[in-house]
């Protein structure tokens, strides 16, 4: 390990790699001092022009937007290694880097709008700014996942206008969105006739389990419905094993139609059972004189109400829940969408959201790029290092041709190389003699 005579701190291998970045970070500080800029603002800033600046930014970007680690913790680590960097410098530097990623994100959006199957979800996201017409700091992080792209948007609204604006560029005559039963998606489907909603069976299953947990008297009934829903998954899986995506539904093999018919029969039995149960609710509540007590009439009023509500919701959303039958490419649940929003949610536990609108926009862009890389099996560290190096070689601007950095344009050989763990050098062999600690400072 080397020794810094100015600070009296021993540098590790990592700090040696990032040593040159302190000069570029100083340039950002000098530039802000000259312009009087605010590190949290949105002013136009040029990225640092050091040949080694990308190394520290790779660490910052991956730590914050991919691993969900607090940036201050990383900066404390650098400080302990003799590389003090202020949080304001990092905030200003990230905003300076934002324009480099805009061409990539624009291309991701165009690619996604050429596809036909999507998974959508949303969650809260705090943006600590005050804007006219909005009370509080509660914003929302929206995710749209397609076969090729994972795209994010952070917006102050949770209305149908947000997915409506996103899908305004949709090119397909018909598209399927796998989602939960949130009303914004229902309104979107009413306004956009080329969008078909496929509702998530995992949420329906959760309805029954929640009812069983809330009312002990409904536990057995809820578990029975859990088993009914559970039988659909293996039937659909067996059907998909025989499915040929190149053929229409009627042109599929005999084995496909065998499982297809079994799936339809199971769904029909489920629908009939739910219909009978809902129809019998009035008889359970007020049985006629001399009439036999209907099954379930021993339940409390609140339990009967809960049971009816769950079954009524199942029937109300039945058409969306059975989209996967006629469109085998549509999954039965929205697990892919929910998995895609998990990484930002984990990071939210540490940073609580974004401190400015610009910061929120940058977060959405980097979430989209990094999660799309993961979708394609590409190591984000490989990609980010090469992309930022190309930006540095292009005069601190995005490359004129970004096709070599688009996952779907990368040939198989190069994609295999980019999917491997990032190579690291072993630190220099330690001296057999202990290194004295410099206490002169």
Model-found features: residue ranges?
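Catalytic center-proximal scaffold of phosphoryl-transfer enzymes
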Residues: 22, 26-441
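Short, conserved DNA-binding cores of transcription-related domains
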Residues: 1-27
């Amino acid at each position: 390990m080397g020794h810094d005579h100015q600070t009296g701190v021993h540098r590790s291998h990592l700090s040696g790699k990032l040593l040159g970045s302190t000069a570029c970070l100083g340039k950002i500080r000098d530039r802000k001092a000259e312009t009087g800029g605010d590190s949290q603002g949105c002013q136009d800033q040029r990225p640092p022009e050091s040949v080694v600046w990308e190394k520290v930014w790779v660490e910052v970007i991956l730590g914050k937007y991919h691993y969900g680690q607090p940036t201050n913790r990383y900066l404390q680590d650098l400080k302990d290694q003799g590389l003090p960097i202020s949080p304001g410098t990092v905030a200003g530097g990230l905003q300076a880097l934002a324009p480099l990623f805009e061409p990539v994100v624009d291309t991701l959006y165009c690619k996604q709008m050429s596809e036909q199957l999507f998974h959508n979800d949303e969650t809260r996201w705090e943006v600590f700014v005050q804007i006219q017409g909005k009370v509080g700091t509660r914003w929302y992080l929206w995710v749209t996942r397609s076969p090729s792209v994972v795209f994010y948007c952070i917006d102050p609204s949770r209305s149908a206008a947000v997915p409506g604006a996103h899908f305004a560029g949709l090119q397909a005559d018909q598209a399927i969105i796998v989602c939960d039963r949130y009303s914004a998606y229902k309104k979107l489907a009413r306004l956009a006739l080329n969008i078909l909603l496929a509702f998530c069976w995992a949420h329906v299953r959760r309805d029954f389990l929640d009812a069983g947990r809330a009312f002990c008297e409904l536990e057995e009934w809820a578990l029975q419905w859990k088993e009914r829903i559970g039988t659909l998954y293996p039937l659909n899986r067996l059907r998909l094993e025989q499915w040929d995506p190149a053929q229409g539904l009627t042109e599929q093999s005999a084995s496909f139609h065998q499982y297809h018919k079994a799936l339809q029969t199971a769904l029909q039995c489920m629908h009939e059972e739910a219909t009978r149960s809902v129809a019998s609710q009035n008889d359970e509540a007020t049985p006629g004189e001399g009439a036999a007590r209907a099954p379930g009439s021993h339940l409390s009023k609140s339990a009967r109400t809960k049971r009816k509500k769950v079954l009524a919701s199942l029937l109300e959303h039945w058409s969306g829940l059975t989209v996967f039958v006629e469109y085998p490419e549509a999954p039965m649940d929205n697990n892919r969408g929910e998995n895609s929003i998990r990484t930002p949610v984990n990071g939210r536990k540490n940073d609580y959201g974004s401190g400015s609108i610009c910061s929120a926009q940058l977060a959405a862009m980097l979430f989209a790029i990094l999660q799309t890389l993961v979708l394609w099996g590409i190591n984000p560290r490989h990609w980010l290092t090469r992309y930022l190096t190309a930006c540095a070689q292009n005069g601190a601007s995005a490359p004129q041709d970004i096709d070599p950095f688009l996952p779907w344009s990368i040939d198989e050989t190069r994609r295999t190389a980019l999917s491997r763990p990032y190579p690291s050098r072993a630190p220099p062999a330690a001296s057999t003699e202990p290194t004295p600690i410099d206490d002169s400072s």
